[in-house]
């Protein structure tokens, strides 16, 4: 970011919200392809100034609009030359640069807002597993939860209008419309779900930016409305970026609430409500009654329909009781369980036995979905019986063992916070036997013969790193070691869902 900031100091157009001029700058395309902002890219890739010169970029934009005219006038998409290999390059080159440009105002405003503030920079705060200690602390005291699937915008203009709140550059908005509509013009018969899948694969960076902007717009208004009736006004952090007329909109909303909706929204008052989201799935948990959750459910449906023009079916929001329902979240099955305990109290010559029950937040490994993921990747069949993986049979023995071992260790690392570790040993069993069968298939031998020949060295590849460290410090049968193996550990170096744990 400091690298980008240095370049933009020479070009003041971005400070007047003119993003369109940046797309004609050569360094933008170099930085767009160098996600780490490494200075050496200009030395290692000497051809960038030739490939992305001012004239070439300007010519590409002109040709894109000319080809777009052909799209609108052509009836047969098979005769459309824009989707040929040569014409497709125009869209790909410009869209990658544009995806980088639209992120600049938000990144720089965040950087400027943090200047002079002593904020601890910790990568652990980015870990997706940092949310589970929060859930353990808060959700164990709540009653109901709304399981919400955030709907996608049906009309593409909704995405453009969302970006319009953040920038004043009309030219950039026109170019954004072109990127969004060029695929829809190519084939208007595809559904919005098919188009989103197509667009996300074609330009993932731009798609993620637009989707996050859509979710940010929804959350900024939803959380503001939620804080009004509950009287729990949050302090705005510097990380929340300013939008056009945002504070004016807030003041207007406060006046509207005071005059018209204060009595109505009083029914939504709940001081024990918590909101959690990851990607397109979110939860709203509350200590209130089921009637309150039903009101929030239909309020959200109407909110999406009225503000975002999104038709959200009520079945996308489920009302569940935490005590008898499990939440499918980030590859875990989470639930609130009543954990009974017996306490003996001695008072002088008399003793009393008190039964005490404490709510605990359990996180379990979903066995059936995990077996489904393993079967999809050809580690086992649909019944969970390990099979060989023929596509790896051409690798060396050490590479095969290393691949299976890395998958096993990474899964144990990801599910280290599980309440019940025994279910993980089925995963280890599937991977170990699948590895042995793959090696036996390669050498045209039996699994039993191969396991005898490899011995303990083969098993060592399937131990977790922390198990290896503990085995050097503590005896395997010691009480401290056993408590460690059974305990829940959340590692704060995990930034995305494991591929095999993503069951969606």
Curated annotation (Swiss-Prot):
Give yes or no: UniProt keyword Chloroplast.
yes
* GO biological process terms held by the UniProt record: mRNA processing; RNA splicing; tRNA processing
Q: Which UniProt keywords apply?
A: Chloroplast, mRNA processing, Plastid, RNA-binding, tRNA processing
Q: Where is this chain's protein located in or outside the cell?
A: Plastid, Chloroplast
Instruction: Name the InterPro entries on file.
Output: Domain_X, Maturase_MatK, Maturase_MatK_N
One term under GO cellular component? chloroplast
Q: Which Pfam families match?
A: Intron_maturas2, MatK_N
- Which GO terms fall under molecular function for this chain's record? RNA binding
Record has Iron as a keyword = no
PANTHER family given for it?
Answer: MATURASE K
Q: Which family does it belong to?
A: Belongs to the intron maturase 2 family. MatK subfamily.
> What's this chain's function?
Usually encoded in the trnK tRNA gene intron. Probably assists in splicing its own and other chloroplast group II introns.
According to UniProt, the name of this protein is Maturase K
What organism, scientifically named, is this protein from?
Nepenthes mirabilis
Q: What is the lineage of its organism?
A: Eukaryota, Viridiplantae, Streptophyta, Embryophyta, Tracheophyta
């Amino acid at each position: 970011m400091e690298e980008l900031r240095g370049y933009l100091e020479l070009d003041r157009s971005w400070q007047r919200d003119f993003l369109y001029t940046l797309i004609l700058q050569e360094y933008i395309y170099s930085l767009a392809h160098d996600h780490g902002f490494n200075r050496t890219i200009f030395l290692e890739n000497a051809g960038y100034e030739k490939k992305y010169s001012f004239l070439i970029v300007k010519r590409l934009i002109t040709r894109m609009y000319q080809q777009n005219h052909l799209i609108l006038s052509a009836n047969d998409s098979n005769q459309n030359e824009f989707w040929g290999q040569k014409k497709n390059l125009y869209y790909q080159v410009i869209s990658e640069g544009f995806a980088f440009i639209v992120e600049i105002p938000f990144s720089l405003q965040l950087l400027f807002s943090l200047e002079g503030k002593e904020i601890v920079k910790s990568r652990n705060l980015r870990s997706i597993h940092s949310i589970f200690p929060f859930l353990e602390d808060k959700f164990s005291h709540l009653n109901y939860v709304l399981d919400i699937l955030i709907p996608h915008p049906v009309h593409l203009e909704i995405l453009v209008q969302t970006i319009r709140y953040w920038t004043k550059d009309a030219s950039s908005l026109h170019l954004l419309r072109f990127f969004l509509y060029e695929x829809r013009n190519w084939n208007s018969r595809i559904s919005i779900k098919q188009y989103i899948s197509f667009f996300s694969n074609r330009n993932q960076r731009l798609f993620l930016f637009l989707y996050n902007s859509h979710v940010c717009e929804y959350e900024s208004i939803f959380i503001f409305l939620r804080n009004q009736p509950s009287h729990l006004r949050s302090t705005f952090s510097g990380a929340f970026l300013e939008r056009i007329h945002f504070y004016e909109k807030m003041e207007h909303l406060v006046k509207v609430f005071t005059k018209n909706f204060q009595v109505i929204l009083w029914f939504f008052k709940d001081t024990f409500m918590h909101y959690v989201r990851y990607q397109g799935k979110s939860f709203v948990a509350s200590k209130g009654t089921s009637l309150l959750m039903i009101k929030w459910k239909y309020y959200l449906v109407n909110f999406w329909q009225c503000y975002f023009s999104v038709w959200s079916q009520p079945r996308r929001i489920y009302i569940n009781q935490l005590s008898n329902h499990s939440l499918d979240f980030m590859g875990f099955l989470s639930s609130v369980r009543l954990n009974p305990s017996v306490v003996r109290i001695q008072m002088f010559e008399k003793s009393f036995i008190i039964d005490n029950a404490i709510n605990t937040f359990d996180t379990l490994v979903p066995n059936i979905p995990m077996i489904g993921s393993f079967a999809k990747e050809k580690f086992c069949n649909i019944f969970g019986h390990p099979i060989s993986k023929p596509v790896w049979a051409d690798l060396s023995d050490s590479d095969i063992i290393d691949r299976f071992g890395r998958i096993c260790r990474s899964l144990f690392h990801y599910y280290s916070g599980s309440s019940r570790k025994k279910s993980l040993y089925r995963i280890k069993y599937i991977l170990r036997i699948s590895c042995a069968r793959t090696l036996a298939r390669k050498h045209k031998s039996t699994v039993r013969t191969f396991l005898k020949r490899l011995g303990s060295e083969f098993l060592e590849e399937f131990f977790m790193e922390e198990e290896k460290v503990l085995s050097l410090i503590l005896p395997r049968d010691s009480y401290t070691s056993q408590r460690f193996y059974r305990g829940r550990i959340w590692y704060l170096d995990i930034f995305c869902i494991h591929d095999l744990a993503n069951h969606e």
